[in-house]
Amino acid sequence: MKPGRITHAIALLLSSISSLFAHPAPSKTEPAKAKFNKKSDKLSEGLSLDPISFSPRNFLAPSESGQRYPWKKSIVTTVFWIGEQPSGNNPVPNRASSWDKNWTKNYGGFDDPNPAHRSNYIPVKFTPRQNPFYCALPYSDKATTGHRPEAPRVVPWFKEAYQGPAVSTCKGRWVAIHKGNRTVYAQWEDAGPFRTDHWQYVFGNDRPKPNLNKGAGLDVSPAVRDSLGMNPTDVTDWRFVEFSEVPRGPWSTLGENNTFVINDRKKGAALAEAAKPSGGPIVR
């Protein structure tokens, strides 16, 4: 027998012996396919979200950029002002706000929107006593007494901001407003336009409801208008921001309600207190 044939015979013999001791391989089973409901990743159109079952964490999950509050994109935005009189598309006067019945008085007067009567984002006739960078969103957490029943669940910061039944947890909250290549920061000081109950939009994923102003979902002050270069009716993006995210700018200089002004006064008072003599006995 030739060497090649001997090698081949030995290989066949070894293969036969090993097959006697081999365990049969288990049959390969296909993994079970998960069953998905096509509606599982979105809300059913007929689903009604009641305040008890609603959890804001489902709606205000961090965006791709890691922000706690995602941007509301392409929102019709209109201009309003403190002291505004009723008109065809604005049936409610703005002498008072949802949270301040003496809004015009506390602001210091009529926030004249006429650009010819304004300079450096404020009226030329007086210096406002409140932040001229303000806005309105169509929700108020306050009821006639106390807060709306859904407020503790739908307002993401309700627990940390709660100061008792008479105080709004929404008033004064900072909002970033973006148009083009500009971003302006304003404080939430009123509820509107038109509605005060649309938490599904303000804190959720709904779009603004139809209204007399082309479905507007945000009102901004003349100062915000001028800083962004807005038209009377325009389109912007907006989102809530933590105060720590707000940079200094024209929105940080004025107002007894302004977080920057309040903090600066506290720092000044603390420094003045620290600079006082200790009052102890003088060592000679």
Where is each model-derived feature located?
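Bacterial N-terminal signal peptides that target proteins for export
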Residues: 2-7
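Bacterial N-terminal signal peptides
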Residues: 9-19
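Secreted/periplasmic proteins
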Residues: 23-284
